[in-house]
């Protein structure tokens, strides 16, 4: 039996210009590379996995998300949904991947009259997977490659969020690689005892 419980009802639901505000995340992990493998861009994408969960009473897959309530920040809401729906904890990036307007297939008549939903999505680096979580009986979780997730993702707006997630992750990897190259070059210069007056960096 789960110690935690999911929030229910919409008494504390936030709205913005008739849009129901939703917060969610893309939980991810990076599989460890084989020491003999080169760290190419293709290898990086293949090692990147995202966690999806099934919808209640259906077999389609989605990312954890739910209503953003008035007693929590948008980041707290995303973290809460990750625990409630997927049973994962981790490091949530403060900068959202984006904000998407959509109409949920499970929307109530009230939502349809108001104007649908506005979803904030974040990237969550998973550090812990819980064996038991609030919605374990109603949801299955699956680790997938980004390519698999794009094919199985039910909603178009979530596909766009996943594409943005991949772009951000690839940009960060590229930046890290460039920084490591600069660091290695600097170390080599020091070991070669090159006069620093003859060294310069082009930005």
Swiss-Prot record:
EC number: 3.6.1.-
Assigned GO CC terms: mitochondrion
Database matches in InterPro entries: DDP-like_NUDIX (IPR047198), NUDIX_hydrolase-like_dom_sf (IPR015797), NUDIX_hydrolase_CS (IPR020084), NUDIX_hydrolase_dom (IPR000086)
Matches recorded under Pfam families: NUDIX (PF00293)
Motif Nudix box per UniProt: ranges: 66-87
Domain of life: Eukaryota
Residue stretches making up the Nudix hydrolase domain: 18-166
Record GO terms (molecular function): metal ion binding; pyrophosphatase activity
Tissue: Expressed in roots, leaves, stems and inflorescences.
Chain positions recorded as Mg(2+) binding sites: 81, 85
Principal location listed in the UniProt entry: mitochondrion
Keyword set, alphabetical order: Hydrolase, Magnesium, Manganese, Metal-binding, Mitochondrion, Transit peptide
Cofactor(s) needed for function: Mg(2+); Mn(2+)
Compartments in which it is found: Mitochondrion
Family: Belongs to the Nudix hydrolase family.
Function: Probably mediates the hydrolysis of some nucleoside diphosphate derivatives.
Protein name: Nudix hydrolase 12, mitochondrial
């Amino acid at each position: 039996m789960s110690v935690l419980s999911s929030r229910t009802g919409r008494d504390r639901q936030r709205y913005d210009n008739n849009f129901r505000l939703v917060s969610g995340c893309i939980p991810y992990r990076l599989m460890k590379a084989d020491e003999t493998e080169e760290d190419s861009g293709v290898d990086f994408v293949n090692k990147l996995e995202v966690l999806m969960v099934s919808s209640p009473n259906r077999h389609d897959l989605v990312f954890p998300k739910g209503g953003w309530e008035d007693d929590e920040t948008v980041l707290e809401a995303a973290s809460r949904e990750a625990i409630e729906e997927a049973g994962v904890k981790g490091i949530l990036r403060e900068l959202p991947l984006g904000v998407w307007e959509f109409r949920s297939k499970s929307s109530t008549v009230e939502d349809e009259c108001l104007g649908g939903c506005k979803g904030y999505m974040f990237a969550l680096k998973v550090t812990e997977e819980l064996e038991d979580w609030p919605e374990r009986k109603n949801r299955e979780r699956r680790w997938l490659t980004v390519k698999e997730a794009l094919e199985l993702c039910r909603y178009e707006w979530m596909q766009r969020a996943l594409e943005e997630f991949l772009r951000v992750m690839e940009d960060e990897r590229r930046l890290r690689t460039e920084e490591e190259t600069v660091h290695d070059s600097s170390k080599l210069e020091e070991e070669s005892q090159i006069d620093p007056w003859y060294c310069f960096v082009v930005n």
